[in-house]
Swiss-Prot record:
Database matches in InterPro entries: VUP
Purpose of the protein: Involved in the regulation of plant growth.
Top-rank taxon: Eukaryota
Protein name per Swiss-Prot or TrEMBL: Vascular-related unknown protein 3
Region of interest called Disordered, as start-end residue ranges on this chain: 45-81
Other remarks in the entry: Plants overexpressing VUP3 exhibit severe dwarfism.
Residue ranges that the Swiss-Prot or TrEMBL entry lists as coiled coil: none
A GO biological-process term: xylem development
Amino acid sequence: MENSALSNCVRRTNFSNQQRTMQEGLEESSWTMYFETEDGLGHYDDSSMMSDAASPMGCVEEDTASSPSNRTEGYSGMEDNTIEEKTMNNGKIEEKILNKNGIKIEEYCAELKKRGLCLVPLSMLSNYIG
């Protein structure tokens, strides 16, 4: 009797495993059919399917407010927020490089040297210490 109960339990387990496998197979095939139909349609040029990045670009007009041709003559902005000013005195061109506070950089460096401070590359300092 125990054998029949055990075999009955095994049969139910096998049947439920087969049924689960069949259900998984049906789910997989339904997804496969879905993808095959989408691939078969082949109309990807629909506006809802095309992103802005994939759309063709028209002519890009230059922004005249930020174009380099509209900068004030005599001044040019540099990367580290300094301004380079070119002036003409007695036929001689002088260049002053000012930081954003209006202090000449040469004078600032001279003041540091007077105080005994100088700029040293970090690698040179690490080689000296290490």
